[in-house]
Amino acid sequence: QTQTSYSVVYLPSEISITPKPLRMEMFRSTGAPSELTKHTDSWFDWGIVDSLMCLSFFQYLNFSRPGNEKHKEVAMYNMIHVIKTGLRYFHRDTAFNLLGYSFMHENQLTNAYSCFNQSLKIRPYHNAAKFYLGLLFNRIHATNRGHTHYGNSSDISS
């Protein structure tokens, strides 16, 4: 018998062991859920990612340290491949956010912007891409002015 996991879920009680980018997914919405949507919106406080994207992102995190450039490139390719060929995945917005976060870490800011923008097209509301875009615009602004930027993503492994 073969079993497959479609999604990896991080609950708010697991925030201390949740990778930083998935923590952002836990805070994708603000305010209290309405009485009408309270039961269907309970997942808004969870970090949910499709299992294959999660594996590819963990590969990237593992190989993002110096000296692993080739493996890091393979992990980035794997994330792109998951998005392009993903037939059975349900959290495309999160996949684009994780890829965008990785591009931001690699200082490929145009690619990062494209990923976050794509994520917002999929899920315009309750999307962590809004936070990421704030960090991205801050980095671009600070870089253009020659200042240190906030939201440094150089330590993405903790």
Regions found by a protein language model. Give the residues of each.
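Nucleo/cytoplasmic regulatory scaffolds in medium-to-very-large eukaryotic proteins
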Residues: 1-158
